[in-house]
Amino acid sequence: MPPRPFIRLVPLALLALVACAVPRTLPAPSQGALPEVERLARFEVGFELPERTRHPDDVSIEARFTAPSGQVVTVGGFAVAGGGFRVRFTPRETGEYRYVIQADGGSGPREVSSGGFRVRPSDRRGFVRRGTGSAHQLAWEDGGPFIPLGENRFNVYDPTWNYNQLPAPEYVAYMASHGMNTLRVFIFTDCEREEPQPGPQPGCLEPQVGRFDPEVAAQYDAILEAAEKHGIYVILTLFAVGFTPGETWKSWEDNPYSTARGGPAETPLDFFERPDIRALAERKLRYVLDRYGYSPHLLAVDLLNEPEWDGNNGEEFWVPWGEHMAEVWHAADPYGHLVTLGSVGLHWNEDGDERPWYSSPRNDILQWHLYGKEYYEVHALAAEFSRKVAESWGYGKPVLCGEFGYGGDDPQTYDHTHVGIWSAIFSGAGVLAHSAPPFTADSDVMMTPGRGQHFRVLSDFLSRLSWSPPLHPQLAPLATPEGTRAWVLGRSGYWALWVLGAETGYGSPVRDATVRMGVPSGKYRVSWWNDVTGEQLATEELTARQGGLVLRLPGFVRHVAGVVEALPAVP
């Protein structure tokens, strides 16, 4: 990995010390007293640099924080709207920290601020990592499992695209009210929009190469602060939309790296292959790290969105680019955020495929997307989720469906959404449903309260489960009537089930359905829930004989969920 540069290329300046636990700012301490923050909360230093001769985005900054243990952590800084600069840092130890900040505004590096602060204990769960108990699971630093469930609400900063035109912070709260925990957001690379009227594209952080819009950046600040307040974790897609020559919506000509917009790249291929252009793109990674990397609620950085569908960019070009960018991020990130890349998946390739990226140690989350008329019917959708997760499982990584959806989802039942999120989770993956106004029938549907309720019920069901030791997908047990299918997450002595009724007669009441579980002899408690309303339907104790356990399901419509747990043997 390349060494971290001594001075970071980003903005800073002088004298205004602020310590904060997002989103509030702590009051200034009395003279001689050190400010305090909670462990894993944000500490922030703001200052001016009036004598600078460089553009704010070219100011070099290095902030060195020394922990109570003696560990030194180095971060950068950034310019803010209205002038001035800031450094953000998240302490991970309790006790007294010291810091020194140097900045170079054009006349050489000099110290612009120094000081200390105290860190008190907190119950914050910390950053999300790859789990230690299972290669396929994510977990908070405190060890609790994290199962991504939420939305690909890619331009949430544009209220006109949100349900009820909610501003982004309110939309984040709305997601949380429906039990979601993950939001995927695009940093747009197509920086001009043509509809409903021409103008700057919302979400374009880098309108010119190496120049970052502080007002747009502040919108991402607000999203992360709302995410921390409401328990949502954000995946930021760093280069999204803008690699298709001659197209309005994904215009390469509106990409700041394109020569058509004054950039250095004649073609998207130049962007992915030329080392000098990669070096320019690295500055965007470092800006995002310096501004947002402090946050434990930045779940992951997603390097690129659907390169196969945005310019038909081949895997032989974007996979090496992705590996390089992931290496740059990991080398610079003191917090260890996860890295992923939102490719379409092995079912849609251009030149080669993404298996080298799936197996790369620099790729932390194996992500793919799922759309298409082949999967409008819910049984086909559920089967494809199972197939794709199984196809991905052998790489030994957490699996995420970063987008799926169908604009024709029935608004009375939202059954496509329902079956998608339950079958994905019970196949062993995290899952994000796409939501947008109905522009494209193949994918776009708003996240109405009725649709959101399906996430709430699934989230509540998952919260009841015992996840330690981890639950893994099991072989599908035999089920009746013919065509009924059961998904199982389990471990020895404990199994969660989701049962989907047969395609024939789907939507009519199902009675006398069974699932045969191959479990050891003994006593078991079996509980069933209505997976649409969350109502508990039944609970009973059963005895398994040599042939296993036959579960007789309560009557249901379409699908039902249950838990089977072994009871202690009675002497």
Residue spans for each PLM region:
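Bacterial N-terminal signal peptides that target proteins for export
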Residues: 2-10
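Catalytic-core region of carbohydrate-active enzymes that cleave or remodel glycosidic bonds
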Residues: 232, 328, 332-338, 360-442
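Active-site mouth of glycoside hydrolases
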Residues: 58-60, 122-365, 372-377, 384
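Sec-dependent N-terminal signal peptides
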Residues: 9-17
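Non-catalytic, glycine-rich low-complexity segments
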Residues: 25-69, 75-76, 116-121, 479-488
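Aromatic- and carboxylate-lined catalytic core of secreted/periplasmic carbohydrate-active enzymes
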Residues: 32-37, 54-57, 396-399, 406-409, ...
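Extended acidic/polar, glycine-enriched regions
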Residues: 64, 71-133
